[in-house]
Amino acid sequence: MSESRIDFRKAEFLISAPDIAHLNEYLPGDVGVEIAFAGRSNAGKSSALNLLTEQKIARTSKTPGRTQLINVFKLDKHRRLVDLPGYGFAQVPLALKKKWQQALGEYLLKRECLSGVVVLMDIRHPLKDLDMQMIEWAVESDIPVLALLTKADKLGQSARMKMVNEVRKKLSNFDDAVKVEAFSSLKGIGKGKVLGILDQWCKPEWLQEQLTAESIEAQIESGK
């Protein structure tokens, strides 16, 4: 069965949870496909989600670190987007930072339905230590990564492409496991490419086979 392109504009808020234990209380098991958005607290995750879904689905704030919870958005009954707590912001109290890091680690290590991770980084300051830790963890776990260089409108086209190429070179040892794209929530730079990658991640082979089986079963039932 050939499935049409995923419509990310249909995303709707599902739940917020302080940690993986509470997340499991609300979700119908560790099933389906989830795509996680992770990044430093000032990387622009909420703005990116709002642009990609064409709605104000995630709260934005001028105060980095506002997203303290795991926020889950439903695309359809099989697919979800997950906005993870921001990490690494210096002004966040240490105790709160440790709590966020624990929730982040629990989700990444225990969530079996994770199909891809978008790691957002300011294009002017990419590949900080925590960004690299996130990328390395995902690759080691056979989870594809999109390194998204945000705020690309802050650089001219030449400088932007130079930075993209530099980051691609630094991540080249990961081969095809990591893709790198420039992105701007303000100007819409890279939106089409990102949606294309997310669409692929939303359609793993096992889910396509399941949807085909469900379609055939529904046709049989309707013919009775």
Curated annotation (Swiss-Prot):
Transmembrane segments: none annotated. One of its GO terms (cellular component) is cytosol. Mg(2+) binds at residues 46, 67. Residues 31-204 form the EngB-type G domain. Keywords: Cell cycle, Cell division, GTP-binding, Magnesium, Metal-binding, Nucleotide-binding, Septation. GO terms for molecular function: GTP binding; metal ion binding. Necessary for normal cell division and for the maintenance of normal septation. This is Probable GTP-binding protein EngB. It comes from Shewanella piezotolerans (strain WP3 / JCM 13877).
